[in-house]
Every structure is written in structure tokens, then in C-alpha cells.
Amino acid sequence: MAGAPRGQGGGGGAGEPGGAERAAGPGGRRGFRACGEEFACPELEALFRGYTLRLEQAATLKALAVLSLLAGALALAELLGAPGPAPGLAKGSHPVHCILFLALFVVTNVRSLQVSQLQQVGQLALFFSLTFALLCCPFALGGPARSSAGGAMGSTVAEQGVWQLLLVTFVSYALLPVRSLLAIGFGLVVAASHLLVTAALVPAKRPRLWRTLGANALLFFGVNMYGVFVRILTERSQRKAFLQARNCIEDRLRLEDENEKQERLLMSLLPRNVAMEMKEDFLKPPERIFHKIYIQRHDNVSILFADIVGFTGLASQCTAQELVKLLNELFGKFDELATENHCRRIKILGDCYYCVSGLTQPKTDHAHCCVEMGLDMIDTITSVAEATEVDLNMRVGLHTGRVLCGVLGLRKWQYDVWSNDVTLANVMEAAGLPGKVHITKTTLACLNGDYEVEPGHGHERNTFLRTHNIETFFIVPSHRRKIFPGLILSDIKPAKRMKFKTVCYLLVQLMHCRKMFKAEIPFSNVMTCEDDDKRRALRTASEKLRNRSSFSTNVVYTTPGTRVNRYISRLLEARQTELEMADLNFFTLKYKHVEREQKYHQLQDEYFTSAVVLALILAALFGLIYLLVIPQSVAVLLLLVFSICFLVACTLYLHITRVQCFPGCLTIQIRTALCVFIVVLIYSVAQGCVVGCLPWAWSSQSNSSLVVLAAGGRRTVLPALPCESAHHALLCCLVGTLPLAIFLRVSSLPKMILLSGLTTSYILVLELSGYTKVGGGALSGRSYEPIMAILLFSCTLALHARQVDVRLRLDYLWAAQAEEERDDMERVKLDNKRILFNLLPAHVAQHFLMSNPRNMDLYYQSYSQVGVMFASIPNFNDFYIELDGNNMGVECLRLLNEIIADFDELMDKDFYKDLEKIKTIGSTYMAAVGLAPTAGTRAKKSISSHLCTLADFAIDMFDVLDEINYQSYNDFVLRVGINVGPVVAGVIGARRPQYDIWGNTVNVASRMDSTGVQGRIQVTEEVHRLLKRCSYQFVCRGKVSVKGKGEMLTYFLEGRTDGNSSHGRTFRLERRMCPYGRGGGQARRPPLCPAAGPPVRPGLPPAPTSQYLSSTAAGKEA
């Protein structure tokens, strides 16, 4: 999901289950928690303060603006000489406080304000608010004052300064950036001071003083309760949003590491330009008729082929682990030499190693690089032979010319090179001599006489060179170039044959002695994080984050300086709230993106029930005040009872829906409607009290009677009821607007519209009544105070609503963006994993991705029974030709790519899921079955079942090639060899890791192909024994001479005895033998390639098996 952060501040119901708990701990769903919540780690707490700095700064500016406006309004009223009760200590202090608040406002408005400085400003503002509040208490400095009605009043009244203290208290909770405990202490001190001063200075003989003090105490309690709730919930929402964003950033960084690791792994297998192009097409396949070919042409490179002479005898004694270790040590060393000599290793085929210089980066001295590479390889293997007293040597062949490089097929990509010049380099290796670098005349011309050479006489040892009259030379090194000291073999007797373990040990020691070389474990260089300490700290922090139970005690990060925290710190330094606000509409604060706005509204408000409970408590407080000081009215009493009952019903309903896990029923529209109705209902109770207390019409004759309309339109004059508690009724109206502040997730726009309506009704009620003529109390003669109070309260609530809305929306935006980036990285990870699984067998790739780099060992696996298949197209070499008209052979390779791609698509079928493509070697396709590990309790398939799958695949390959011939008017013929037996699978080559299988089984399977007959499937006697029980039909071929094995009895697989393969395909001998065109349309024939039997480049006749890579794994004995 993009854009909706799971479990973010109050949104635990939308998105990932448990997301909120992960951020808030087990108690995260309670309405409010103990104060003083903060992270245990100072570093994380500092990050959170930095995260909220700009928003806290904006809130502080709003608080100082309200306080300045309050002090300024009171100062202006004093300046204009508004009548009122006897002057107290506040006389003359309001202008001073106004100046102080304005000065703090200017200081706070500095852009470069730091967290500590903002906290100091908040503390100063709280201190000045305390002095302001104390001076507003009902102290008396002078004698009796005269009311506007002319009546004498006491020296002070109990209601004096209450609304100012209520407003200052709420501002300290909702907008000032001070600690929660400090704000609570402020609220308690202010309330206690007013109550004590009132009790001490108001004349005790005033009737019902205790009732007035009780009403004041209830009002202070209500405001403090609402302030604490707003304070705690706002901070909790921000902390949860911060942790949610941090979790996403942590996951993103972890995924970034994994993706970087996967990218490095991908780059180690393929050149960057090829890998990036293939990755893009693999993830978003373009619509096209033909499969895209990833081939590039390089016209001036040098190709080196090298073969280890005598390796077969050395490896014949080894175990699986020893063989993989030996190969990795040798070829790891060769990879290091290739890097030093600016060569790129292309592939390892058995014990054959070939590389190219000048491929990825053009080099003018590519021939020199390859010669140096060949000489270094000879020196290396000579040192091995001397140290182990094993007859090992290296045969190296070089040629300079043109290559086509890239990847063929759709699965198990392997970078390779093709061209007639590659073929010639391969022949140069086969026609060379051990310990010599064999070069052609073309390569010699590129060396500019920098090396001494001698005639190679390659034509005397190779028919190919003799037929094409190719002159060859040997490089004559001037001296022994590189000697590997450090091995002492005095304890080993030369006459005694060494065991393989001894040979392997000495070989490993030898490989390590030069430049402290140690062959890397394959993929270890791409698995290791650059800073393991950072990774360890990140992992520790992650575990603690997931295991914490609360904010205050078990929160994360005992390890300071983690990578995630440093990353967030840099983000916060670059964060600009103004830019984030650009995503919001300035007036409505809605997101400009409709989809994001919809997802924001889908977040559930887990504190909505708590807000309703608080509204119920406030209604109960109004009921107590009504009973204490306000004249009772049946209408007001009924309204109060209805309000309490409705709120109780709402609370029960919300609790039931929450217990039954139906949070989705409270949509944003329902929550907004409930919020408006509850606020209007509670405010109506307070307004009803006001209506009952204020005189609505006075007779023109007397101030002591009230004119009302009776039934029938008659006017009735009633005696006026003294209502000294009208001030408390008006205070209830002010406090009645506070429920708007506790519904945090209701948008600010409906709140401000509702505030406007409530304020208007309040003013209308006051102006239409004669409230200035109410006898006694603080309202007597102070007509400005009720209007000033409601305007300041409404202004404060409007600013707070907008501030909370901005906070929640920016928190959501930050968390959503972090989660979107995390999800993007997750998609990249999955995409990279798909690509890696296309480069390596899935279980092998997963092994390296899951392994700890520090504990990673060589990957190897022994298998007792594996089916191996080689399928070649021997007459493709007759088809291949390099001409300007076909882009020097690219179009011919395009058709080969179509053939291999169709074979790959055939393997994608579910029936062939147990098959594993190993590689392609020129036009030879190599696959195996029985390599995948069995998962859990899944029954292991028998080798007979595996061989049936392999045989059916081979049969289907004939049909696929037959279809291609039909479409392209070609006559390609398939030749297949199958064998079964033990193999060793592993990954070798640290810098260019490569998965392969080795063993006598692989060699014999290759011989079954190379000694086979076109259009037939040749199998060994063991395969015949296992498959004849599965209704397959065979023809005995007889004894066949196999290199390294002598005479072997082989069979031709003809198909099933019932004429069908195991999944309904038919395999007919006549189709295999006659695959050429049968008429009809064409779809894939490359226009520039001849259909059959083209002349190969002059002087280069077709090779009998593979013109490209004659020194293949098929011809090597591992």
C-alpha cells in the first residue's frame, strides 16, 4: 500500500495489524496514559524534539499571540476606563504582560531557533502566564466600588478573573512547548491560588460562598482535565507517528542494504550496462513478437582461453567440499589476476577458464593485458606444481579480433561471447603446449614487438590451423616472472605420493602467500555491509523496537549513534515544513492529492471513545454546577438528562463496536457528525442556563419585573428573579466549547464553522438580553467581559484546531512518504530477488541471501542421483556466418536466442518445475534434474520419476525446435545425451560467482551428446535401466567409444511405448529426423541469415560439435 502508513498515530485500525502496537506498546490503545511519556534514550528523544521543532514553534507563536491579545485587550479596557469592581493587583500589570508576551513572540519568530531555546521561551511564557494569572485573582486594593447600577458591592467577588485563568490554563496545555508535568503543575497552582484567594478575601458573610467556590473548582477541574487529555493525546499521536516513520525508515535502510547487496551480486554476474537493460525489460516486458536480444559488438578485443593440464587426475581423489574449495582457490586466484590485468572473466567451463580484455572498457593495450594474464596464470600453476609435486600445467591460447557479447535466453543468464575469432582463440588453446602462451599473428601485430616470440607451429598439431593456414607463435618470457615463496616442503618426501588433502592444503597455503591473498567466498564480497558495527547496532535497535512495551520504560535504543538515528537527523536538518505545507490546501488543510486525502480519512480514531467519555464527564460537571449555583429550570434539567443519557449510550455503543472489532463503522463523516452534535448538545445545556438567568425584556416602568408572553398572546409581567450566578452560566458556555478540542481527528474546517455558529449564538443571546442589568456578580457594569471572553476562547480553539490538524496531517504525510519509500524498496527487493532467482537456482540464491557473511562458507552440495542432459544443435554452426548484411552474425544469434528462449519457456511449465537449467554453451543447452532440496515433509521423488521428467523435456524440445523450423524455414536438428549418477554442485569464483555441477556423470552426459546421432536421444545403460520400467521405448545402439571411458553400451530413447509422453505429447521418430520446413507462413526467420549450409568465414570450416566453445564442460573431466 502506498500512502497510508500502517498503524500511524491513531490509525491502528487501517493498515497492517499490530502497526500501532509496534509503535506504542501494549498500552497504546488506552485513551490516555500517565504524563511524562518520553523515550528512554536521550538521542531518540532529541530526534523527536527536532522532529516537532517547527510545529512546536508555530504553536508557541499562536500561544503568545493569544496571550498578548488577552493582556492587550484587558489593558485597553483599563485604559478606556470601563467600570468594574474595585481595582485589584492586576491594575496596571496588563500592559506590562502584553509587552512581555510580544517580546517573546518576536524572539520565537526567529527562523534559526533551536530546541533548547524554544523550551526556554516556553518556560518564560509559562512563568509570565503564572504571574498574569495570579494578578487576575480577586485581590482588593481599595475600598468599595460602585457598580453601574449604582449599588454598592463588596471589595471583591468570587467570579473575578475566572475566565482569564481558564483561558491561560488551556493555552498552557494546548499550545506551549513545556513538559506535561510542568503544565499540570501550572494548572493546579493557578486553580488553587484563585480558590484560596477567593476563600480568604471574599467576605465570608456572602451567602452561599461555598457553592460559588465549588462551581469554580468544577470549572477549573474541567479545563485541567481537558487540557491534560489534549496534551497527552496530541503528544502520543506525534510520538507514534514519529516511531511509525522511524520504523519505515529503518526498514527502508535495511531494504536499501539488501537491494545494494543484490545489485552488487547482479553486477558481479553481468556487466552493468547489460544488467540494467535486462533488469528493466525483465520487470516490464515490452510487447514484441520476438524475444529481445542483449548482444553488443566489440571490434577490437583480445580473447584468452586457458586450460589446466593434469587437473583431471588431481581432482579424481577429492570429495565434494575439497573439489569446490580447490576450484574456488584456483579460479579465485585467476579472477584476482584478471582484475589486475584489466581482463573480464567470461565463464568457467570445467577446468577451462576464458576471459577478454578491452570488453567493458576499450583499451588500446588489450593484447598486452591478455599476454600478461596468460603469463601470470602459467606462473601461478607452476608454483602449484612445484609445491605439491603434482604434474600440473597451463595451456594458454590467445587471439585478437571481434566478439559479440551478451546474454541469450530467458532463464539462468550467463554472460558469454561469440564469434569466429572466439572460436579461433579456443582452437589456439587446444593447439598450444603446456606452459606456453600461444598467440596468432594478429595478436602479435598488436604487441608492437614488446615481447620475444618464437614460432608456435600450431598447424602441425591442429588440423583446423593447418587447413586455414594460420601462423602461430609462442611468447618467450625473459625470466621466471613471479615466484611464490613461503612454502617449506622439507617434511614431505618426494618419493611418497601425497594424499589429496595434503595437496589441497598446500595449494591453499600457496594461494595465500602472495600479497596475503585469500580466495573470497563466492558472494561474500557482495554480502558484507561496509560497516558491520552499523549493521549490528541497527539490528539491536530493531529488535528492541519490536519488543518494547511502553514509551517510558522499555522504549528503544540503548545503543546511541545508530545508523537510523543519524539518517533521521540528516533528514530533519533538511526538512522544511513550508515545503511540506505545499501539499496541503492553505484554507481547508486538505491534501491536494485526492487519493491521499481519502486514505487519511480511512484512519480510525482510537481516542474517539475517550473523547465521548470526557464529554460525558463535562456534562456531569455542568449538572453539578447547575445544582450548585444556577436557578433550576425544568427545560434545562430535561436537556441535561437527555445529554447525559445520549452520551452514555454513545459510550456503550462505541465500546461494543470496538470489542466486536467493528472500527470501520465509524467513518470520518459519522465521527464529524457525532462531534458536532455532542458539542452542540453540551453547549445547549450551558446556553439554557444562560437563558434562564438573563432578563429578556424589562418593563418600562420598573427594573423589578419581567415581561413575558403568555398563552394567547397576552403580556404578563412577572417579578424579576435575582440571578447572581449568571456569570457561572456564561463561564459554562465558554467551557462548553472545549469539547471541540478533544476530537483530534475531526478536521479543523467543520470545527471553525461550528465555533463561528456557537460564538454568534452566544453574542446574540447576550445582546438581545439585558445582561448588563443583572444585579450583583462580576458582570455588573462590565459589559465587555463576556464578549471578550467568548471571542478569545473561540480564537484560541480555532488556532488550536488548525494547529492539531496541521500536525496530524504533516505527521501522516511524513510517515506516508517514509512508508511509500519503504514499499518502493520492498518492491525493488522483490524485483531484484526475481532477477537473482533467474541467475541462480532459487535454493542457491536464497542460501546466499540468508547467510551471515561472517559465517558464510563455500556453497557445495553432493547428490547421489542426478539426471544430466546436454542438448545441442550441431548444424547451427553451418548456419552461423559473419557478414555486414547480418550485422556480423548478430542476426544469426537472434535466431539462436529465439530457440533458447523457447526452451526456457518450455521449462517454465509446472510439469518441469523440478528441472534446473545449468547453462548454455554456444548452441548447447545443459539441464539437470534432482538438484532442488526437498522441503519439509514433502515426499522426495524417486530418480526414475526425475528421469521421466527429463526425458519428456527432451522429447518436447524436439517439438519446440520443429515448430521453429516450420516458422523460419530452417532445418535445425537436435541431438541429446542423457546420463544419471552422482554429481557435485557448487558456486565458485569470488568476483564472478558461477553455479555449476561437476563429476563423471556430467562428463559422460556430454559424451552422450557429442557421440550421439542428430535427431536422436542417446542415453547410458543406467538411464535405460531406470526408464524402461516407465513405459519408454528404446533401441540399443551398441558399443560406443567414449573418451576417458572406453567402450560404453548406449541406447536411443524413442519415446513411450504407448506413444505418449507423461503429459500427452507425442514423440515420433520421423518428426525428429525430418524437422525441416513443411510449408506455411513464417514468423521468426531473421531476414539476413541464410537458411542452410552457408559458407563459414574463409579458412574456418564448421566444428563438429560447437564452433563457439569447443573447450566446454562437455569435454572436460572435472
UniProtKB/Swiss-Prot annotation:
Residues with the Phosphoserine modification: 550
Phenotype of the disrupted gene, per the record: Mice appear grossly normal and healthy, but have decreased levels of calmodulin-sensitive adenylyl cyclase activity in the brain. They show impaired spatial memory. Mice show a significant reduction in daytime contrast sensitivity.
Expressed in which tissues: Expressed throughout inner ear development.
EC numbers on record: 4.6.1.1
Glycoprotein as UniProt keyword: yes
Polar residues biased stretches: 1105-1118
GO molecular function, one term: calcium- and calmodulin-responsive adenylate cyclase activity
SUPFAM superfamilies found in the cross-reference section: Nucleotide cyclase
Name of this protein: Adenylate cyclase type 1
Originating species: Mus musculus (Mouse)
